[in-house]
Every structure is written in C-alpha cells, then in structure tokens.
Amino acid sequence: MSRGYTARGFNSGRVTMRKIATGRAWVMALALLAGGSQSVAADLVLVAGATGRTGQQVVRELNAAGYRVRALVRDPAGARNVLGDGVEYAQGDVRERSTIDAALKGARYAISAVGATRKDPANGPEFVDFQGIRNLAEAAAAAKLDQLVVVSSAGVTREDHPLNKMFDNVLIWKGRGEEAVRASGVPYTIVRPGGLTDKPGGQSGVRLEQGDKGTGFIPLADVARVCVAALKSPAARNRTFELYSAQSGPDTDWDAAFARLAADPAPGPVQP
C-alpha cells in the first residue's frame, strides 16, 4: 500500500470505491492499490547504435525495464530483423543532425551505443564517435532531454593506446565526443567500459572507477544494465566513469554506486 493509504482507508469514508466511479479516478485508485508507484512505460528512450552488439543489449534491458524504445537506424527494415517488433523505428543517422531532431520528438531520454567501423571511411571515428556524438548531444540539449547516456570506452585519455594506431585514433575521437557531450548542456552520463565480452550479465559485480587508469573486461549485458540504471538516478548525472567486472556479487544499489563518483568539472571549449 502507498504511504498514507491503508486497506482500512479504502473501506472508510475517506476513500471509497463509490467516490471514484469512472474515468481517471479509477486509474488513480488502481495506482494506489498497486502501491502508488508510476510505471516507466510512458518514458520513451531513443537508442542510437541500437543494432550493434552493445545497442542490442541496451534495447533488451530497456524493454525488460518497461520503457518504450525507439531505435535510430539507417535501415528500419533491416533493424527490425535484428531487434523485432517491440521497438519503434526512426530512420536516421547520427552524422545528420536533422534526422536526430526528428527522432527525439516525444523522447525523455537517449542512450548512445554508436561506434565507428573499419569498412567505410565515412563511418570512421571522426565522423561517428566525434561529430555524430556531438550532433546527438546538441540535439538532446535542444530537445531538453532529461538525460543522455553515452557508451564511450576506457582508454580515451591515453593517446599512446595501441587502438589509436590500429584504428584511426578511435579513442582520441571518442574523447573529443565526450568533450562535446559535456559542453552541450544536456544532463549526461558517460560510461567507459573496458574490454567487451559476450559472457552472461548479472553474474558478478562491477567496478566503477574514475581517472582512466584501470584495466579489465565487462560483459556487454552488464554495460547495458548500468546504462539503464543511470537513467533514473540523479546521482549518475554529469559523471564520467570506467566500468569493469568485479569479483563481488551482483550489484543492486546503483544509486549508492553512482553517488560515490565525483561529478565532472565544468567543461572547457570544444575544438571544432
């Protein structure tokens, strides 16, 4: 029962079923009987990069949590083959700002799981991990979203990281994308996972670190769990952290974990 309402209260003169005969009052009464909590089902989340390995896990986690999910995809028909029918589809591309603006209509949150590919230079790190993320952040700020969660990567501050030599300075461009998110003005959470694995999620705890000095691995499913947990936690806002698996048992108190993190300092100017 919700606080202030008891079973006796519903049978007394204060609140009776006769007094809530029709319409919205019935809905309110049912909500009270259910415990007074509001479902997140009406909250729409736009997911960029929804068909990728991390994005698919994010969509699955959002659906399990009762959110409405809208996937920003280049090919809706192809995406439907991957994600199924329990998702809305908005045709667009993070490299094209106008398509993001349209896709964000009605959304309360957004999660980015985008990443560059080696196959097409036009999908390289500069254009996806920096310019695309900047487009998404600025569109999210213009749409006054409650929060933008961005999956980045551990190692973004290490210019000598081998991945930069192997893949067109991918971590440097991801770092530039992070800077654009911080400067955009939208409330945000930046998640920097370590090496990604396909192991089942929820089997162990996770380590939330700051300073970009650690190493480790993390299941994709656990990255998705943390992203979705951050959506409803004020303690996660305007924070950047690395994410690795831990030896402890599965985490349950996400608010406490986020609250132990330091908030990001005020952002500086972003290079064009």
Each model region followed by its residue ranges:
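Bacterial N-terminal signal peptides
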Residues: A25-G35
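Aromatic pocket-lining residues of Rossmann-like dinucleotide-binding sites
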Residues: L62
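Sec/Tat signal peptide C-region and signal peptidase I cleavage site
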Residues: S37-A41
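Glycine-/Pro-rich loop/turn segments that contact NAD(P) or position catalytic residues
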Residues: A116-Q210, T215
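NAD(P)H-binding glycine-rich loop region in Rossmannoid oxidoreductase-like domains
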Residues: V45-L46, A50-R53, A71-A142
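Conserved cofactor-binding/catalytic machinery of classical short-chain dehydrogenase/reductase
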Residues: E96, G132, G177, P219-D222
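Bacterial N-terminal signal peptides that target proteins for export
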Residues: V15-V27
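Mid/C-terminal beta-alpha module of Rossmann-like enzyme folds, strongest
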Residues: A42-T51, Q57, A221-P272
